[in-house]
Amino acid sequence: MKKRIILAIVSSVSLLLAACGQEDSTSSQNSSQQEIVSTSQESSEGQSSSKEEKKEQTEAYYTSDTGSVTKVDAQTHEVVDTIAIDGSAHNVQISPDEKVIGVTIVPSEGHAEDSSDSNESMEMEHDEDSDTSMSNESMEMGQDEDSDTSMSNESDDEKGIAAFYDTETGEKLAEVEVGSHPAHIVFTNDGSYAAVSNNGENTVSVIDVSTYEVVETIPTGEGPHGFRIAEDGKTAYVANMGEDTVSVLDLESMEEINRITVGSTPATTGITSDGQTLLVTLNGENALAIVDLTTNKVEKVAVGNGPIQLFVQHDDQYVFVANEGTEENPSNTVSKVDLNSNEVVETIEVGSGAHGVVISEDDQYTFVTNAFDDTVSVIENETNEVIATVEVGETPNGITLK
């Protein structure tokens, strides 16, 4: 029985969230959640050995605008560590070697989690992605991060922070000054650099992780928010919420090399592993833009209300889009889009204000932060059902797995 409980990723994943004021779940809630997860795990025993051989996820990190990053054990649904942050934590990502957590921080009020608040480029409250920010991203967050609706270019010149923490000890390794209203943070696949989108000043800061120094600041379009870096580490695709475009950045020459018009209020991006297809959430028109990067042709797929972050499955078969809506008109769904047919094949009901989204490495589970009801939903991807709902801190946004 113990082996069966350990089998699935949900029982081995610990969630790290940025949230303060975390409320402890009652023992009865923990028990019922564990039973749900255990049942799901037992039913998955017949899955192929190739999936079982894939690396298991063990922890997840996500942030909240209440000023902390919190680690939660997914089996017990208990907080095991909380990192207090001086400011508003927006988005988070773990380094490729899983030793470092990067967090974007707005020193005072700023990026809240509400995609609604304006169209992310006005991301006042929006996302891993996020989130997610690109839940992508969205906006994490959630974000994922990410209240992903662009904080907009306020004339606030106060610089933001990218902070880095040891995943084992929670010790702060470095604090780097970046631009105004930092939104999302993404590591290159080799772990050499971390890039931060500065929503308030239309730039991306590139940080050398070996020295924790900004080595370049790259101009972008208006209101940069969620973004992803291609697998080869050479190109970043940044959603500009303020001007309906995506900036294409060359990370070798450290300059913008193209700008693609995609649609209203792009919140975050995703890219397939072959680097041929770009996915962009269009918060202003409730759609997902699918861009053929060989031609820059854009196809749009209608999704839910107020899409923020997205995450592409590792096998490139599906993309999951978190639909946050607004505080006045919240959404509580995730759209699952088939990338072969470019159609929504499932609409999954989660918590209110779906924001950050991330998928386990074996593609079996999707984790979604729900910004308006302070929970995380765990989706079993084969059945498209929510198998666990975890109570977390206030306004969770960006989310990333270890």
Where are these regions (language model features)?
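Predominantly soluble domains enriched in secretory-pathway, periplasmic, or organellar proteins
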Residues: R4-S12, L16, G21-K402
